[in-house]
Structure formats: C-alpha cells, structure tokens
A protein has these predicted regions:
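Kelch-like beta-propeller repeat domains
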Residues: 2-5, 11-13, 21, 25-350
Length: 350
C-alpha cells in the first residue's frame, strides 16, 4: 500500500508557505522531521456509491451503513478491518439514509434515518446483526455519541424538531434519559471526559448554538453555547477535547471550530481552512480530522495542542460523507459532489 501526495499538492504547499514535516512521492520520503498524516491509496471502495450514510467502529471493524445511491435508498453495510480489508455483512434491516451510528460495548448501532425511521440495527464483533428495541421516536438527521456504558441517540426530525434522547447499554437495553433542552436536528455529537455533548442543530428556522452534556449517569447539564449557532456540521473527540467544526449558520457556511475540554470549558480554535457544511470527522492518533464538505476535498487536522495543520486533501471533493476510525486509520467514505461517490480515503500517521 503506497503513500500518495501528488506533485500538485507539493507545489501548492511550497507556494503557499505551508510547513511540511514530510512529503512523499509514491512511497519515497523526501523530508522526515516528525509524525505526519498521510493518505494511503488503493482502499477498496464502498458497495454501492452513496451519500447520507453513517459510520462507526467497534472492536476491529469500522462499518459504513445505509445511504442514498443512484438506484435509491440502500441498506448496504461495508466493514473495514484494521488492515483495510473490506467485507460485506448482512445489510440493515430497513434501507434508509440520513441515519446515525455509535458504538457501545462490542456493538456498532445504526439508528433512525429517513423517512423518520425508529429502527436500530446492531452489529457485534463477528458482524452478526441483531435488531434491538427501536428508538422511542422515529426520526432522521439525529446525532449519536458514546458515554460510559451507553450509546446515546439525540435530536432529529420527525415532522417536527425532536428533543428525544435514547440510550442503549452494552446489552442493548434501551432507556430514556432527560430530553435535550430544545428540539433540533442536523446537530452534532462527540464525547469528552465523562460527558457526551450534543451541540447546535436547526431549531425551527434558527441555527442553534445550544450544547447539552450527558454524564455517565445520564444526567444532563448545559455548558457554554457554541461560538456560532450552526447545523449540518460535525464533531469529533481527540485526546482531552471534543471539537465541533464547520456547518451552516442559516445562510453563510461556517469555518468555526469550538473545543470543549473535560471540565466543559469552551475555547475557540483557528477556523477550518475553508468554510463548509455537511462534512465528516474522525480521529487518528493525536489528530482530529475534518474532511470534505459542500463542496470541498479539504482536510483540516487539529492535534492535542489544538494546533491546525492541513494534510493532503480527499481524493475527490464531496459532502454528505461519513467517517470512522479503525486501527491506525481514519476512513472517509461515500458522499456526493456531482456524481455519488464510493471512494474511501484512509489517513494514518507515518
């Protein structure tokens, strides 16, 4: 598996003055002064091409499920192991898109989706599918995060903005914690310390800045709001921070990035290199990656000191993609940017 960073990227980097710790042509390192994010080639694509899918990882596999393809809504699931070998498990029980996914125990859970589905599908370490109790309210454009022994599914849209939260434990038993402080959809969620955070979203005709935090006992608190209200964005955890990046501020696209530490203190970071919405995020090593967006191939990386760098872009500009981490790789799969995409880009630390 070779490492690629094209001549055009090298030229652009030098012309812009971007510091490069390592540049690679093929697999030949030209410079090497420390850990660097690189994108690997020849990852087997998804089957089929699609957008509006969801992804999460548990155990030794990252799973990409659901979405909308050229032939319609799909139930397809693709699994990638730590060596980036792809297998195709049993599909979702119901085809759907704009669903979400989270891990708990040995399971990856896919929940919700259009059109206002309440279905939850769970895949164990052997990729066997079971169908636990459905969500309390069917909805799409919801968000999910793991905290302690629970996977939480919050918000969404089901004819109206939803504040519902469903929690599944490691035995796939569902309970219903306190609802979000306001109903909203197209929100984002991530975990930091002892908290799962649900931030932003679209509430009525306004871009929300609200953040709700759930601890391991599923008690809800309300930390400082996002610096900018926005929706159709993404969140990711790295080291001691949960980062919320990009989005739509009900008109202009946003490049804002907010970081919450384990005490729920918020700081505002160097913004993304390009304002964009409907992007995806994943972490690898000590880097949080924000990739793609409408319509961009850009990737922004934030390390544990919250310093931003700009690694090689995705292989193609696309949005409504999904991302997950497995082994030493952060994977960005699917999306649309003209044609629907089956591409999977993998980032690792060299």
């Amino acid at each position: 598996m070779g490492i690629y960073l094209g001549v055009s990227e090298i030229k652009k980097a030098f012309l812009s003055g971007t510091p490069l710790k390592q540049i690679c042509l093929g697999a030949i390192p030209l410079l090497a002064t420390g850990p660097e994010l690189v994108c690997v080639e020849a990852v087997t694509p998804l089957s089929p091409e699609r957008f509006g899918l969801a992804a999460a990882a548990a155990g030794s596999c990252a799973l990409f499920g659901g979405g909308l393809s050229n032939s319609g809504v799909v139930a397809a699931v693709d699994a990638y192991d730590a060596s980036l070998t792809r297998t195709v498990p049993t599909p979702l029980s119901v085809a759907r898109h704009f669903l979400t996914a989270a891990a708990v125990g040995e399971y990856v859970l896919f929940g919700g989706g259009a059109t206002s589905s309440a279905i939850v599908d769970a895949y164990d370490a052997s990729l066997t599918r079971t169908t636990p109790t459905a969500l309390g309210v069917g909805r799409r454009l919801l968000a999910a995060a793991r905290i302690g022994n629970y996977a939480l599914f919050g918000g969404g849209h089901s004819g109206s903005d939803s504040a519902a939260v469903d929690a599944y434990d490691g035995s796939l038993t569902r309970i219903t914690p306190a609802a979000l402080s306001e109903g909203r959809y197209a929100l984002a969620a991530a975990t930091v310390g002892n908290y799962a955070l649900f931030g932003g979203g679209l509430a009525g005709s306004a871009a929300a800045s609200t953040v709700d935090a759930y601890d391991e006992s599923l008690t809800r608190t309300s930390p400082a709001a996002l610096s900018v209200g926005r929706y159709s964005f993404t969140a990711v955890s790295v080291e001691n921070y949960a980062l919320f990046g990009g989005g739509n501020a009900y008109g202009p696209k946003s490049a804002a990035v907010d970081a919450y530490d384990a005490s729920l203190t918020r700081s505002t970071l160097t913004p993304l290199s390009r304002a964009r919405n409907n992007l995806a995020s994943a972490a690898v090593g000590n880097f949080a990656l924000f990739g793609g967006g409408e319509t961009s191939a850009a990737v922004d990386a934030y390390d544990e000191a919250l310093t931003r760098t700009v690694p090689a872009p995705l292989s193609a500009a696309r949005f409504d993609l999904a991302a997950a981490t497995v082994g030493d790789y952060a994977l960005f799969g699917g999306g649309r940017g003209g044609p629907y995409s089956a591409a999977v880009d993998a980032y690792t630390i060299n």
